[in-house]
């Protein structure tokens, strides 16, 4: 079972992401956070196999949350999602270490492919077959 955290301040988007992921794979355990502060609290109290994180949120934005994730759980892949599809933010999040960046409204096939890839990569990391996202050393 894969445990996925969705950090999204827009309830409608959060619910859609939850529903799409649950329909994709009934074994996904989905946890929701309503903003960056709530997301960090959940990250600090539980381990996740994947995190989906909005960028523009009140209290703490997604870039701040991503930095926290990379510090506290660097091998947890994070997919950044934003309705403000500006290239600068996408580049910054990828440069920092996000697994992927997806614009809202998300193309559901692209989102699901990214989720599958991130979880597969995470399984390789857990098994020690890939050192981590940053080193780019593959032992496959």
Model-derived features: positions:
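Conserved acidic carboxylate
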Residues: 8
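Two-component/phosphorelay signaling modules centered on CheY-like receiver
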Residues: 11-31
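Acidic, metal-coordinating helix/loop segments flanking the phosphotransfer/catalytic sites
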Residues: 32-50
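Acidic catalytic/metal-coordinating carboxylates
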Residues: 35-38, 61-64, 82
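Short amphipathic alpha-helix used as the core "switch/output" element in two-component signaling
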Residues: 41, 63-75, 92
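Receiver (REC) domain active-site loop signature in two-component systems and cognate sites
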Residues: 57
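C-terminal output helix
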Residues: 86, 106-116
């Amino acid at each position: 079972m894969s445990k996925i955290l969705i950090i999204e301040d827009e309830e409608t988007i959060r619910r859609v992401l939850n529903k799409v992921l649950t329909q994709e794979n009934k074994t996904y355990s989905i946890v929701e956070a309503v903003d960056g502060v709530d997301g960090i609290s959940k990250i600090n109290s539980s381990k996740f196999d994947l995190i989906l994180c909005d960028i523009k949120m009140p209290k703490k934005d997604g870039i701040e949350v991503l930095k926290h994730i990379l510090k506290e759980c660097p091998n947890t892949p994070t997919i950044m999602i934003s309705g403000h599809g500006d290239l600068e933010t996408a580049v910054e999040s990828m440069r920092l270490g996000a697994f992927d960046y997806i614009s809202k409204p998300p193309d559901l096939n692209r989102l699901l492919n990214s989720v599958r890839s991130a979880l597969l990569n995470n399984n390789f990391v857990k098994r020690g077959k890939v050192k981590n996202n940053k080193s780019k050393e593959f032992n496959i």
